[in-house]
């Protein structure tokens, strides 16, 4: 009964903390507004703190004055003074053909969209470069991977990522 469960949980904790080969699979909910990452420990889902201890990472990417990517709260704060180079709500455009997107909708964003063939891209004035929406979302995933590895004190090689229903 309960002693067998306790022994299993103790064994799992030992493996998690001590065994360098114990693989952790993280789950990432790459949201339009926020991103969350979790993992299972002792049969319970645990959400990993990402952005200065917050469990929600704003799904925002910006190019800072040093021409580097910022992700999360730092990027979101740049919406006030760096609107052309701060990208948000990008997930909804991943995998969609440019023809299927209402061009009037794109005018509501402070950053510039560019149609390149069938693809929709965003333009960074600081970098003078176009990026696929997937590349912007990849910056969020890189941040999540780094933050989760710091928290777990292990390299993450496996993950599950949620995808929108229209995929």
Question: What is each model feature region?
Answer:
Residues 1-58, 65-167:
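N-terminal phosphate-binding loop and flanking beta/alpha elements of the actin-like ATPase fold
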């Amino acid at each position: 009964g309960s002693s067998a469960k306790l022994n299993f949980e103790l064994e799992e904790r030992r493996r998690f903390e001590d065994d360098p080969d114990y693989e952790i699979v993280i789950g990432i909910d790459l949201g339009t507004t926020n991103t969350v990452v979790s993992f299972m420990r002792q049969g319970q889902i645990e959400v990993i703190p990402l952005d200065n201890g917050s469990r929600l990472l704003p799904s925002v990417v910006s190019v800072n004055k040093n021409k580097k990517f910022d992700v999360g709260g730092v990027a979101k704060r740049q919406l006030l003074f760096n609107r052309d180079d701060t990208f948000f709500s990008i997930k909804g455009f991943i995998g969609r053909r440019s023809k299927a997107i209402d061009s009037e909708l794109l005018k509501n964003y402070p950053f510039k969209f560019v149609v390149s063939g069938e693809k929709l891209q965003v333009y960074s004035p600081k970098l003078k470069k176009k990026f696929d929406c997937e590349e912007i979302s990849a910056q969020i995933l890189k941040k999540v991977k780094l933050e989760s590895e710091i928290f777990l004190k292990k390299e993450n090689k496996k993950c599950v990522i949620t995808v929108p229903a229209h995929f």
